[in-house]
Amino acid sequence: GIEPSDASKHIKQKRIKSINKFFCYKTSNEYLDKYEKPKIITITNVLAQIDNLNEFAKSLGNIIDEKSLIIIEFPYLLHMINRGLFDLIYHEHLSYFSLTPLKLLFEKFGIIMINFEKLDLGASGPAIRLFLAKKDSVYQTSNKVVKQIKYEKKWGIEKIKRYNTFEKITKEKISKIKKIIYLKY
């Protein structure tokens, strides 16, 4: 695998082949020079921290073949907004996602969404586990994905009104927290 953290040392001790670098196009080529195309790629709670999403998606498209499966878990924007989960937002996260923009991003690099699961408790709160594959693969996009993207549009994913509602909910929650703190002291 490809693992940029110190965890790669433990992986190598268990005789698992890995490259200790950040994932980018150059690293994907380095991987392919040494190993076969992967059957499964798992990416858990990393997507929000990636600063160059085009490079990331291009690299994924480069490293997979028609039998590869990509599994990405990330905090789901609609859950965060609907539930007012402002406490899940922090400085290391550069972006929060719904399926709609990710579909556009990955399709630019020949990758399709094939399915997803909603998780009430992912690595950092409510999340989506998204399954992706090469466009010309053995996989097809499920109706579930198509319906969810339609739902996101109907919900107003592209409308500022939804984000203003999140701001209002956040301010109300902060006000309640301040009242509780004031009553306690």
What is each model feature region?
Residues 1-27:
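Class I SAM-dependent methyltransferase SAM/SAH-binding core
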Residues 39-42:
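A conserved beta-strand element that flanks and buttresses the S-adenosyl-L-methionine
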Residues 111-122:
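Conserved S-adenosyl-L-methionine
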Residues 54-71:
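A short glycine-rich, Lys/Arg-flanked "PGG" loop and its adjoining helix->strand segment in the class I
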Residues 122-173:
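Flexible, glycine-/basic-rich loop-and-beta segments that form/coincide
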Residues 72-95, 99-102, 106:
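Short, glycine-/aromatic-enriched active-site segment of Class I SAM-dependent methyltransferases
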Residues 26-37:
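Short amphipathic alpha-helix with an adjacent loop that forms part of the alpha/beta core around
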Residues 46:
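Hydrophobic adenine-recognition pocket in adenosine-nucleotide-binding enzymes
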